[in-house]
Amino acid sequence: MNFLPKSRKARRRLTILAVAAPVVALAVGLALWGMRDAISLFYTPAQAAAAHVPAGRKVQLGGLVKAGSVVKHPDGLVEFVVADQRSTALVHYKGDLPDLFREGQGIVASGAFDESGTFVANQVLAKHDERYMPREVAKALKEQGEWRGDGQAPSYQGYKPGKPNT
């Protein structure tokens, strides 16, 4: 019983397909493997807590800076809490904050969680006017049913400075 096509043209096409398919699959696999460190997933604090993001994994954390949570240390370390009404995350950032960074406003921080669950940011991006919300933050808030299109800052109940509510 012969499974190969009878015509020479069909056998040639099958041979080319049998050689090309694994080569293309290998190329796509290598490209994705090479980009694994460049891919940065976006989470809100609640999503990060639910997903149990492993320590050291590069992610973006977005939400609103909780009022009264910003602490600037003499060594240049800035500590603040990012919240999304369901959960909060403590963020440490060493460096200069954007000029538009302020409490009650939306931010997106890039970095990784450490072993203690603190988000260590290497970059902080702030919204640029009263009406703008970073796309990822707005989408996440809409999915959670917490979106406020009127620009009002949400109120946070039960917040204690220095300790994130999770």
UniProtKB/Swiss-Prot annotation:
<keyword id="KW-1003">Cell membrane</keyword>
<dbReference type="InterPro" id="IPR012340">
    <property type="entry name" value="NA-bd_OB-fold"/>
</dbReference>
<keyword id="KW-0479">Metal-binding</keyword>
<keyword id="KW-0408">Iron</keyword>
<keyword id="KW-0812">Transmembrane</keyword>
<dbReference type="GO" id="GO:0020037">
    <property type="term" value="F:heme binding"/>
</dbReference>
<dbReference type="InterPro" id="IPR004329">
    <property type="entry name" value="CcmE"/>
</dbReference>
<comment type="similarity">
    <text>Belongs to the CcmE/CycJ family.</text>
</comment>
<keyword id="KW-1133">Transmembrane helix</keyword>
<dbReference type="GO" id="GO:0017004">
    <property type="term" value="P:cytochrome complex assembly"/>
</dbReference>
<keyword id="KW-0201">Cytochrome c-type biogenesis</keyword>
<feature type="topological domain" description="Cytoplasmic">
    <location>
        <begin position="1"/>
        <end position="13"/>
    </location>
</feature>
<protein>
    <recommendedName>
        <fullName>Cytochrome c-type biogenesis protein CcmE</fullName>
    </recommendedName>
</protein>
<feature type="topological domain" description="Periplasmic">
    <location>
        <begin position="35"/>
        <end position="166"/>
    </location>
</feature>
<dbReference type="GO" id="GO:0046872">
    <property type="term" value="F:metal ion binding"/>
</dbReference>
<feature type="binding site" description="axial binding residue">
    <location>
        <position position="132"/>
    </location>
    <ligand>
        <name>heme</name>
    </ligand>
</feature>
<feature type="transmembrane region" description="Helical; Signal-anchor for type II membrane protein">
    <location>
        <begin position="14"/>
        <end position="34"/>
    </location>
</feature>
<feature type="region of interest" description="Disordered">
    <location>
        <begin position="143"/>
        <end position="166"/>
    </location>
</feature>
<keyword id="KW-0997">Cell inner membrane</keyword>
<keyword id="KW-0472">Membrane</keyword>
<dbReference type="InterPro" id="IPR036127">
    <property type="entry name" value="CcmE-like_sf"/>
</dbReference>
<keyword id="KW-0735">Signal-anchor</keyword>
<dbReference type="GO" id="GO:0005886">
    <property type="term" value="C:plasma membrane"/>
</dbReference>
<dbReference type="Pfam" id="PF03100">
    <property type="entry name" value="CcmE"/>
</dbReference>
<comment type="function">
    <text>Heme chaperone required for the biogenesis of c-type cytochromes. Transiently binds heme delivered by CcmC and transfers the heme to apo-cytochromes in a process facilitated by CcmF and CcmH.</text>
</comment>
<feature type="binding site" description="covalent">
    <location>
        <position position="128"/>
    </location>
    <ligand>
        <name>heme</name>
    </ligand>
</feature>
<keyword id="KW-0349">Heme</keyword>
